[in-house]
A protein has these predicted regions:
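N-terminal short leaders/motifs
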Residues: 12-41, 103-117, 151-152, 237-272
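Short linear motifs in intrinsically disordered
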Residues: 60-67, 144-145, 283-287, 321-322
Length: 390
């Protein structure tokens, strides 16, 4: 979806790196990844072990479970997980596995419940994971419910977004670090957008027949925008990008809104501003990829969030949410579909070319090609990705 550029002061200039043109940070000689990284089951298994089992993985936003008993299920590295808010308001993550004989506890993708009960033998767990009911187990000598709480998964929040980490925090294996430490380089960077307070107006799930890395690479450049996104290019020039994060796990910057007031079908703002912005901020949209499965697009009137869930070397589920100021939902001039329809169109254009790339890369004729200087961010993303597989 992005990148291109020219220099301009940033609202975060006093605390963050300067924004630079995409071409200024390009490392000459960079090429796309070899074929095996997109088609090999062995590489995919490595990714699931070294990345998705050992890093902080985005699974949702706290607004999805606003009340006690609200829950959703998700999958990380092949593991089914339950994310639930307890009666005290705390959010927990548990493996979706009964401590009795291993049955899957919850089949729904989301819901509301006063407790978690196994459908097999009715073992029942409190929302904080404690076993509170186990029929006839008092007949078992030495049985203590306190020994059979649900297995918890590391869970933490950043800016209202919920992350889990399957690594063993107690042993520090896999280079485990806390979520606060992981996101320390971004401290305060997105505070103007009030991310923790936003609410989702819509989620669309996309099933894309392409490797998850192709999604990241596509998001990170606008070299393709003129040909692939005519509607977007009319509003936001494909060569208008500047980036302040150009190496490491967090990459991105902004692009300009040259026509209209927002990236919507009408070109008009579709909701109340989500933060306190200066006049020039209403002409900028910020796009950041946060390794390994989060794409964060920050608009003046909404935030678009992509959550990636790799399924196989050639298939990725993408969950896209549009988040708005909660006060906007009360107003008659709230038009969320103006933004949703626009980006649903752009998303589908992107997924199509990603699927074409996957098909071509699978050919015996494929070999890594040279990146353009306008693709400095995908090249940087590749470098960071390879670091985790070594």
């Amino acid at each position: 979806m992005r990148r291109g550029a020219s220099r301009m002061p940033s609202a975060q200039a006093d605390v963050a790196p300067a924004f630079r043109k995409t071409t200024e940070t390009f490392m000459a000689g960079a090429k796309s990844l070899p074929q095996r990284y997109f088609v090999s089951p062995e590489v995919f298994a490595q990714e699931q072990k070294k990345i998705f089992s050992e890093q902080w993985i985005l699974v949702g936003h706290q607004s999805q479970i606003g009340k006690a008993g609200d829950y959703f299920t998700t999958e990380v590295a092949g593991e089914s997980l339950i994310v639930v808010r307890d009666k005290r308001g705390a959010i927990h993550g548990f493996y979706n596995v009964c401590r009795h004989r291993g049955s899957r506890l919850i089949e729904n993708t989301k819901g509301q419940s006063a407790a978690i009960q196994c459908p097999y033998h009715a073992w029942t767990y409190a929302l904080d994971g404690r076993l509170i009911g186990a029929p006839h187990m008092d007949e078992v000598s030495g049985f203590d419910k306190a020994d059979y709480s649900l297995h918890a998964v590391n869970l933490a929040l950043w800016e209202g977004f919920i992350f889990v980490n399957l690594a063993d925090a107690s042993t520090q294996r896999g280079g485990y670090i806390s979520l606060d430490k992981w996101f320390a380089p971004l401290a305060g960077k997105f505070s103007r957008w009030n991310l923790s307070m936003l609410r989702s107006a819509k989620r669309i799930e996309y099933d894309v027949r392409a490797n998850w890395k192709l999604i990241f690479e596509n998001y990170s450049e606008c070299y393709h925008c003129l040909g692939v996104h005519p509607e977007l290019s009319k509003i936001s020039p494909s060569d208008s990008a500047e980036n302040d994060l150009t190496e490491g796990p967090f990459l991105g910057g902004f692009m300009r809104i040259a026509k209209g007031k927002s990236l919507t079908m009408s070109g008009n703002a579709c909701a109340l501003p989500i933060g306190s912005f200066e006049a020039h901020d209403f002409h900028l949209v910020f796009y950041y990829s946060l390794f390994p499965n989060m794409l964060l697009s920050l608009h003046p009137d909404y935030v678009m969030l992509h959550q990636l869930r790799p399924q196989s070397p050639g298939r990725t589920l993408i969950f896209c949410d549009w988040l708005f100021n909660p006060e906007a939902f009360k107003r008659s001039d709230f038009e969320p579909h103006d933004a949703i329809e626009f980006w649903d169109l752009v998303n589908k254009q992107d997924w199509h070319v990603c699927e074409l790339s996957q098909q071509g890369i699978a050919s015996r004729a494929y070999e890594p090609g040279p990146y353009s200087p306008r693709e400095s961010i995908p090249a940087a993303w590749d470098r960071e990705y390879l670091r985790y597989l070594q």
